[in-house]
Amino acid sequence: MESQQLHQNPHSLHGSAYASVTSKEVPSNQDPLAVSASNLPEFDRDSTKVNSQQETTPGTSAVPENHHHVSPQPASVPPPQNGQYQQHGMMTPNKAMASNWAHYQQPSMMTCSHYQTSPAYYQPDPHYPLPQYIPPLSTSSPDPIDLKNQHSEIPQAKTKVGNNVLPPHTLTSEENFSTWVKFYIRFLKNSNLGDIIPNDQGEIKRQMTYEEHAYIYNTFQAFAPFHLLPTWVKQILEINYADILTVLCKSVSKMQTNNQELKDWIALANLEYDGSTSADTFEITVSTIIQRLKENNINVSDRLACQLILKGLSGDFKYLRNQYRTKTNMKLSQLFAEIQLIYDENKIMNLNKPSQYKQHSEYKNVSRTSPNTTNTKVTTRNYHRTNSSKPRAAKAHNIATSSKFSRVNNDHINESTVSSQYLSDDNELSLRPATERI
């Protein structure tokens, strides 16, 4: 009866054999599948006895390897082959552009023979494999007890980054290199390589490893064809074909220069002048901005500079707009000269212009405030009393008296002058004043 059931269900043989093998130690020279069917009940009886002694049961490593035996239990995941990094498949640039890359993890997996031996700038093959970009895992070694369940755990990165990093677009022209390098630097920063990229001052936080250098070199070539690079980049790579960091450092410096150019353009477009500062200071400011733009190969014509300056004039300088509106040949030096002339004229007029309201210095207000009272009492004293404080009637009397006295004196003086002149002309004698007789 039992043999018929075994023939009807042959898989039960493997199940019974597996239970007996895993629960009882078997000699290394004996195949667990070679046990006859007649001895199966005996193995089953032994297995019930051994199940109560699980503490002394050996591990699965005691079971000899058998290629014909398929175990229903999943095999344990082997430890990583390269330290803390795990092996990942390679991907071509076309696949990388179609789907987001993962983060930087295993740069040593790249084939870097050309990086070590190539005498010139290497042109990558369109199907050149590029690694996945996965962040570094934790440096702590895995616990050997948890190796069985390692396949179900998700490795955690050191830093919080996105799940995917979008690769930079391929460089299409030499003029777009300054824009492309911004995306490439952002691509490296999002991939946990920002600490090896030079900052605005050309400083880096740490030295990059050989694998990181190889990765930067290969990704730079994959997305920046050599014939589309600017001349200054080609000159650097002709000296040292792998000196990508120097290219990035100078690119960052040029970005700062471009930012200064933008600031200069904004300052030139928003010029304002109303005479509150000297004309010389205004001229120096404008000339410095124009000269700085010229050093960066940006020439500002006199006509454009004059239009921007005239737009910002106000006050007494505003009428210069109408004067230069019909002019076709504008000279910046001439405009500065006219601004200086108006500024000097206004300065002279302000010095000679009398004040509309005279300040009476003879009056002095003295305010006294009592600290104990809330009301403020103001007392005005006239320390210098003048004639202006007399009543109007007294003023009129004094004026009439003084005018009458002046007329009498003037008539007397005129009469005596005429008589003395008449005597001197006729008799040529000088009269002495009469003296009183005693």
From Swiss-Prot:
Biased composition (Low complexity): 369-381
Name of the protein: Transposon Ty2-LR1 Gag polyprotein
This protein's domain notes: The C-terminal RNA-binding region of CA is sufficient for all its nucleocapsid-like chaperone activities.
Subcellular location: Cytoplasm
UniProt region (Disordered), positions on chain: 1-86, 364-397, 419-438
Site note Cleavage, residues: 397-398
Gene Ontology terms for molecular function: RNA binding
Quaternary organization: Homotrimer.
A GO cellular component annotation in the UniProt record: cytoplasm
Ranges of compositional bias, category Polar residues: 1-11, 19-39, 49-60
Segment forming the signal sequence: none
Stretches the record annotates as RNA-binding: 295-397
The protein's role, per its UniProt record: Capsid protein (CA) is the structural component of the virus-like particle (VLP), forming the shell that encapsulates the retrotransposons dimeric RNA genome. The particles are assembled from trimer-clustered units and there are holes in the capsid shells that allow for the diffusion of macromolecules. CA also has nucleocapsid-like chaperone activity, promoting primer tRNA(i)-Met annealing to the multipartite primer-binding site (PBS), dimerization of Ty2 RNA and initiation of reverse transcription.
InterPro entries found in the cross-reference section: TYA
Gene Ontology biological process: viral translational frameshifting
Keywords: Cytoplasm, RNA-binding, Transposable element
Further facts: Retrotransposons are mobile genetic entities that are able to replicate via an RNA intermediate and a reverse transcription step. In contrast to retroviruses, retrotransposons are non-infectious, lack an envelope and remain intracellular. Ty2 retrotransposons belong to the copia elements (pseudoviridae).
Disulfide bond positions: none
Organism the protein comes from: Saccharomyces cerevisiae (strain ATCC 204508 / S288c) (Baker's yeast)
